[in-house]
Amino acid sequence: MESKSLKSNMLWNSVGSLYYSTCQWLITVLVARLSSGFDAAGILSIAMSVSNIFSQIGLYRIRSYQVSDIHEEYSSREYVGFRLETIAVGFLITIVYALISCSLEMLVPILLYLLFRAGDTFVDVLHGVDQQHFRMDYCGKSMLIRATLFLVSFTIGLAFFNSLNVAISGMVLSTYLAIIYDITKTRGLSDIRPSITLEKSKRLLLTCLPAVIGMSLCSVVVTYARQYLGEACGSPALGIYATVCTPIVIIQACANYVYAPLLGIFAESYDTGRTSDFISLLMKTLFALVVIFAVCAVGFVMVGDQLLGFIFGPTIAANGNLIYAGLLCSMLTALVAFLSDLLISLRDMNGCFIGNLIGCLVSFPATHILVSQFGMNGTSYSISISYIVVSIILLFRLVRLVKPKAIA
């Protein structure tokens, strides 16, 4: 099949991802609007946060590794087979985590949301095949279809059944039906029948393990901060915080649209010794990230309170001050994600692990101190401080990798 240009790939990926992220945000709007009180919003927030732990294990950072596999160490069949293995392991580990750390009322919503994320996670490896063949238009169209279906299903579940569990169940059903589209398109590019071999699975498992642990620890920073806020200040406070800060996640997702299609190009430039091209692309990417957040920051300063009041009502608008610390937190989260994925594409798994481990260790005392001192804003402060530490370490590792090639 005909490959698309880089600009076309970035456009389709951006449109689909932005729409998908917007629909995910609208879910948090709907749960706040259609539910009585903020308990359901708080429970959904916890389910989303816990699912991020599953996502790190299920994804196993394979997408970044896969699209930068310029020497084709593994086939599409092996990537798909390995993804099925990581989904199963991630599901079991996350269920155990939920049983230990979450209340009984949260277990069913968490389980259902994990099923939703499992479908999402499987589609990701298919999109990796699409990206390798420069057909990210398939990715964009898939996200448009899946987002529309899960948003409609979630709305029906809340509006007609007044049940968060029914609403999430609708998301699960619609997502699994939409996967048929992805399978149909991707198998036209490559053989995607799962291939599971002990030797290849073990090698891929051990190669990516440090990065996976690192990115799981990265997710723990956010999950722990939010859970502690809920324990210290109650579910309503967590619901308010999650509702106010969720629009910022869309901005954070925009950062991913910028760099995700470029990871293979970064890897090729580094592998072939074109250091000047690598550094130039790195500077352009970082500049684009700064511009995105600067524009959004100005927008929130100008109309943030009015926007929150219009969408969520006066109760949420009264807490509009949370959005500024949340924006800083989101910017740093995007930076950590980019630098981590970049190190993975350059095969520095240990650097990804070390940076995120130290950041996670910093987050525990920071969360206790800052949430106690600043309440809901303390959650964003603790995450931001942790991710500043991570970013400094990851940048140091990146310089160590690139500098010798630049000198040579």
Model-assigned labels for residue ranges:
Residues S55-Y74, Q132, V244, I248-G273, ...:
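Helix-loop junctions and terminal segments of transmembrane helices
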Residues L44, M48-S55, C218, Y241-A267, ...:
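Transmembrane helix-bundle signature of multi-pass secondary active exporters and lipid flippases
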Residues S36-A41, L99-Y113, S235, V301-M331, ...:
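Interfacial segments at transmembrane-helix termini and the short loops linking adjacent helices
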Residues L107-L114, G140-L189, T207, I358-V362, ...:
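Hydrophobic alpha-helical transmembrane segments
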Residues M1-E2, L6, D137-S142, L164-M171, ...:
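Interhelical loop/hinge segments that connect adjacent transmembrane helices in multipass membrane
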Residues S3-K7, S64-Y74, G119-M143, L328-G355:
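Membrane-interface junctions at transmembrane-helix termini in multi-pass inner-membrane proteins
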Residues K7-Y20, A47, I53-A98, V108, ...:
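Membrane-water interface segments that mark the loop-to-transmembrane alpha-helix transition
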Residues K4-Y60, F91, L151, L209-P236, ...:
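Signature of the first transmembrane helix
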